[in-house]
């Protein structure tokens, strides 16, 4: 069993409240879950109004497929996010 994962940080546009951040993050998580077979969560920086840290994972039997899908996720985020992608890390673990 292989778990492929991506973690990325987004710099958000200027926000007036944490509710605005939740709206942006929830929208992105929903878009990712609808488009890709992933589990998605905000994994860090929940109290930050400037940044969001998102993680997503996929259980697969192919490291190549999993990492290829994560690169597609990254491209999707770059083109469909209300913020600016700051950094991303893609990796896989075999269990």
Please annotate each region the language model reported.
Residues 59-95:
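C-terminal structural segments of small proteins and small subunits
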Residues 12-17, 60-62:
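A generic structural motif
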Residues 21:
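C-terminal binding/interaction regions
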Residues 36, 52, 84-86:
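Residue-level signal for beta-strand positions within conserved beta-sheet cores that form or flank
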Residues 38-44, 86-89:
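A short linear hydrophobic-aromatic micro-motif
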Residues 4-12:
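Short glycine-/aliphatic-rich beta-strand segments at the starts of folded cytosolic domains
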Residues 5, 26, 31-41, 66-67:
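Amphipathic alpha-helical assembly/interaction segments
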Residues 3, 41-61, 93-95:
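Short, charge-patterned binding micro-sites
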């Amino acid at each position: 069993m292989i778990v492929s994962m991506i973690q990325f940080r987004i710099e958000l546009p200027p926000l007036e409240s944490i509710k605005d951040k939740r709206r942006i993050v929830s929208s992105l998580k929903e878009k990712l879950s609808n488009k890709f077979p992933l589990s998605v969560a905000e994994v860090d920086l929940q109290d930050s109004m400037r940044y969001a840290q998102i993680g997503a994972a996929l259980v697969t039997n192919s490291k190549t497929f999993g990492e290829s899908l994560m690169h597609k996720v990254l491209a999707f985020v770059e083109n469909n996010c209300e913020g600016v992608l700051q950094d991303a890390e893609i990796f896989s673990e075999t269990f």
